[in-house]
Amino acid sequence: MEPIEVFKALSNESRLQILQWLKEPDRHFAPHEGIDMNTIGVCVSQITDKLKMTQSTASQYLTILLRAGLIKAERIGKYTYYKRDEEAIGKLADFLKTEI
């Protein structure tokens, strides 16, 4: 994980909001076809609906978070599910504690 890329990813309010929502997906999203959102993640269409923006914009935001290493993606059938990468977020917290 590159700290500059992480900070760039988090500098957008909507991307930060996505990361916050994914911390407690059951609280922020309706269930999706029997998927355990805490284990598998949240479908891009659910994130798009909650953001009230186009799927292409939401997908761009998710790609930026993915490239920064803050989230993981898993494709199941025709859907892609996203969840936080807790290990990477823990490393970011450690970086902030020790380096800044």
From Swiss-Prot:
Domain of life from the UniProt record: Bacteria
Gene3D superfamilies linked: Winged helix-like DNA-binding domain superfamily/Winged helix DNA-binding domain
Keyword DNA-binding belongs to the record: yes
InterPro entries: ArsR-like_HTH, HTH_ArsR_DNA-bd_dom, HTH_MetalResp_TranReg, WH-like_DNA-bd_sf, WH_DNA-bd_sf
UniProt KW Transcription keyword: yes
An example Gene Ontology molecular-function term: DNA-binding transcription factor activity
Pfam family, any one: HTH_5
Residues annotated to bind DNA: 44-67
Sequence ranges assigned to domain HTH arsR-type in this UniProt record: 1-100
Sorted UniProt keywords: DNA-binding, Transcription, Transcription regulation
BP GO terms, sorted: regulation of DNA-templated transcription
Protein name: Uncharacterized HTH-type transcriptional regulator YbzH
